[in-house]
């Protein structure tokens, strides 16, 4: 039995992860935490999320005493916190010997030079960063098991990389073009005008400047063109990706490349049949569908995930179970 502390449990991802861990027979929840100045401290989780009324846990402030209690009682800590907050908390809990699963972007790049540009801060813990493993569960299981610092991937990168990594050896130098649409929960729980009911509409954002672009490119080993879109639905991501494959590549070659997922229970791959968001919402699954034109050499692959599940909470749970061999 492994004891897990969840910090940032009041947000969509933290609450979703709480529900997932609560349902796991081999995991227990050491505690749920929010910042000391949070308006949610002291509230039962069910006050914020009535659908979780079966989880009788209260949101505690992350005081120094609380941090000491976590170190004494927990085997691991999950950080569903802002990037700049995770930066420091992850390093501190790692130094105390706990396994850290960070859902922010604070440890996703191995190159410290990336952080000022994409996250607005200098990375102060290069020695911890050097130990961090990118937690793309289907691809990095051995490394996830071997380290105590796991950077859980972003939602768009999870959808995109799951689709693209099997094709890496078949790609030409032409940049893959990724157009991805995410539900409004991807923007977080905090009230914002552009995500309010009367304002939300299908629209691109972060064009040629979204921080997930270099994350995808780094893990793929090739530059990409990535355009995210805000969708007018609650949950889910659909990424439609166009790539050029090397001359002589056949449909059979593509099928062979995607056979890497034959033993991956959470990834479903279909040829000439494309996924929809409704099929993956509230599940930990990724559905892929692809079609290849041998004459032009162009392939289109679509990837559907739930942004709060496979794109965040359920992938964190995958990483926890891989790390602890559960």
Swiss-Prot record:
InterPro entries: AGPR_AS, AGPR_type-1, NAD(P)-bd_dom_sf, NAGSA_dehydrogenase, Semialdehyde_DH_NAD-bd. One of its GO terms (cellular component) is cytoplasm. Its EC number is 1.2.1.38. Its main location: cytoplasm. The keyword Oxidoreductase applies. It is an enzyme of class 1 (oxidoreductase). It is found in: Cytoplasm. GO terms for molecular function: N-acetyl-gamma-glutamyl-phosphate reductase activity; NAD binding; NADP+ binding. Catalyzes the NADPH-dependent reduction of N-acetyl-5-glutamyl phosphate to yield N-acetyl-L-glutamate 5-semialdehyde. NCBIfam families: argC. Belongs to the NAGSA dehydrogenase family. Type 1 subfamily. This is N-acetyl-gamma-glutamyl-phosphate reductase.
């Amino acid at each position: 039995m492994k004891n897990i502390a969840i910090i940032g449990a009041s947000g969509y991802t933290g609450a979703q992860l709480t529900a997932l861990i609560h349902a796991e027979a081999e995991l227990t929840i050491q505690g749920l935490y929010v910042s000391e100045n949070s308006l949610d401290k002291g509230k039962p989780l069910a006050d914020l999320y009535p659908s979780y009324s079966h989880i009788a846990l209260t949101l505690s402030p992350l005081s120094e005493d609380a941090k000491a209690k976590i170190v004494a009682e927990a085997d691991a800590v999950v950080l569903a916190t802002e990037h700049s907050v995770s930066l420091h908390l992850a390093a501190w809990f790692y130094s105390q010997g706990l396994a850290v699963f960070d859902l922010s972007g604070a440890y996703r790049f191995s190159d410290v030079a990336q952080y000022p540009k994409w996250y607005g801060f200098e990375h102060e813990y290069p020695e911890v960063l050097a130990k961090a493993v990118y937690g793309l569960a289907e691809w990095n299981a051995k490394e996830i098991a071997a380290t105590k610092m796991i950077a859980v991937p972003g939602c768009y990168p999870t959808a995109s990389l799951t689709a693209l990594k099997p094709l890496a050896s078949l790609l030409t130098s032409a940049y893959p073009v990724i157009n991805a649409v995410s539900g409004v929960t991807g923007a977080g729980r905090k009230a914002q005008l552009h995500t309010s009911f009367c304002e939300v509409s299908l629209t691109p954002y972060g064009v040629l400047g979204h921080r997930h672009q270099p994350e995808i490119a780094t893990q793929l080993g090739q530059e990409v063109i990535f355009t995210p879109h805000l969708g007018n639905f609650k949950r889910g991501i659909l990424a439609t990706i166009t790539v050029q494959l090397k001359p002589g590549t056949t449909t059979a070659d593509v099928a062979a490349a995607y056979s890497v997922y034959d033993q991956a229970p959470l990834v479903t791959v279909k040829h000439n049949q494309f996924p929809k968001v409704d099929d993956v919402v509230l599940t930990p699954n990724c559905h892929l569908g692809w079609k290849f034109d041998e004459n032009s050499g162009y392939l289109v692959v679509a990837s559907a995930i739930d942004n709060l599940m496979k794109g965040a909470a359920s992938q964190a749970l995958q990483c926890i179970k891989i790390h602890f061999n559960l």
